[in-house]
Amino acid sequence: KGPMVMLGYYKDPEATREAFDSDGWYHTGDLARTDKDGHYYICGRCKSVIVTTNGKNVYPEELESMLLKENAVKECIVTGAEDERGNTIVYARIFPDLKAIGATYGNRNITDKEISKAVSEAVKSVNSQVVSYKAIKRFEIVDKEFKKTTTSKIKRNQ
């Protein structure tokens, strides 16, 4: 709320109504936490949070940022998915960094098996750094970059 906050969404009164409360406060949709010193940290977005079957919240952005630090991963999207028993699990779609993977094999042509191994190791590395309910249970390797917005952000709904 204040003079520097937007007045609303252009030609979208419904989105404007959803974003502002009755007192005029703008709700960004960001989720945050505070540490013991009172510092705020943005964890993720309300619209993208994954609620596991046991009720735990998983913030995809946290896992995506960890995956992107791995050499084998160029782009990724983390979402919720159902396993064979209908439970919600953490699922990742990963576009591999073929150049980085190739560099580990002397810049020769790399096989699908080598790509799969490198991505699998990246997922294992991330999983070793998080609590079990946040672990990526299933992943898929995609062969094309993800569609992007005009600001070069990956479109989540693909």
Regions found by a protein language model. Give the residues of each.
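A structured beta-alpha segment of the ubiquitous adenosine-cofactor-binding alpha/beta core
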Residues: G24
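A secondary-structure boundary/capping signal
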Residues: K1-G2, V142
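Short secondary-structure edge/capping micro-motifs at helix/strand boundaries
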Residues: A15-T16
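Conserved C-terminal "lid"/linker of ANL adenylate-forming enzymes
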Residues: I77-G80, V123-Q158
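AMP-binding/adenylate-forming catalytic core of the ANL superfamily
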Residues: G2, L7-G8, L31-V130
